[in-house]
Curated annotation (Swiss-Prot):
Domain Rhodanese: residue ranges: 123-217
CDD domains with a match to the protein in the record: RHOD_YceA
Designated name of the protein: tRNA uridine(34) hydroxylase
Domain of life: Bacteria
Taxonomic source organism: Shewanella pealeana (strain ATCC 700345 / ANG-SQ1)
Matching Pfam families: Rhodanese (PF00581), UPF0176_N (PF17773)
GO MF term (any one): oxidoreductase activity, acting on paired donors, with incorporation or reduction of molecular oxygen
Amino acid sequence: MSKVVVCAMYKFVTLAEFEKLQSPLQKVMETSGVKGSLLLAQEGINGTVAGSQSAIDNLLAWLATQPGLDNIVYKLSFDDVMPFYRTKVKLKKEIVTMGVEGIDPKKVVGTYVKPKDWNQLISDPEVLLVDTRNDYEVQIGTFKDALDPKTKTFREFPDYVKQNLDPAKHKKVAMFCTGGIRCEKSTAYLKEQGFDEVFHLEGGILKYLEEVKLEESLWQGECFVFDNRVAVDHNLEKGQYAQCNACRMPITADEMALDSFVQGVSCLHCIDNISEKQRQRFIERERQVQLSKLRGEAHIGSDVSQVIQTRRAKKDRLKKAQHDKSA
């Protein structure tokens, strides 16, 4: 089994004083050796973190002691290397940004469907299957016959619904996303818009891949994830995609062989949209990345304080050596 445990979690719960959780949560993550990002808002908690099994267990145990944060929904997957550089706890207005006031999954939400029952539901010809994720996620994998809203961000999803879905015409709507959190809001939104029978995949794609055998699966392709793995396969192991550091789009090995791909600077998805000023900035950033690698440091998204400490330690050792030599 891989050494690094990746834990995606969320819970919609009213956290009246969520700001006060930021500092102690950051401290618990750092002392446990957990990296990744967690978002806190009045509506709850969301994020993905990684560490050893004991580190993740410690974090989940601590969260369970906090009012309202017991029974957090989480999914585990594994990686051979740490997929995050930093430890961050951020304060937000929403833990998943739809931008529609009054949508509260704690009050109204669609019907949860277990992974084992999902195939039967989406095989029903009367069910409209909608992928709630962004276009760059859908392009590398989705469920058979699912509709692609072609949204750039989740904020665009309500407009897609208004323009393309009709409660009178679409009697049964099933939706899915990576870990389940976006569907909490998307199904709540549809219910508010008058849709009656609204379903969503409990635990999201990740839970489906974990519980449904490959030979029985209706999933096609890989699943995009928001960490350095870029995507995972049906075994929840790192997939075949890399990521363009300029536009963050997933890219294949064949796409990296094209003239449009320059490491850290451009790929076929963004080369025509990058200004000369941006290109020069990306070139300089990539140069710094390569220099950092030569020094044994991380650069993009790295823990800056750790890098500074490493450099200071090197300087201190050099000064001491020079002092000892002159003494």
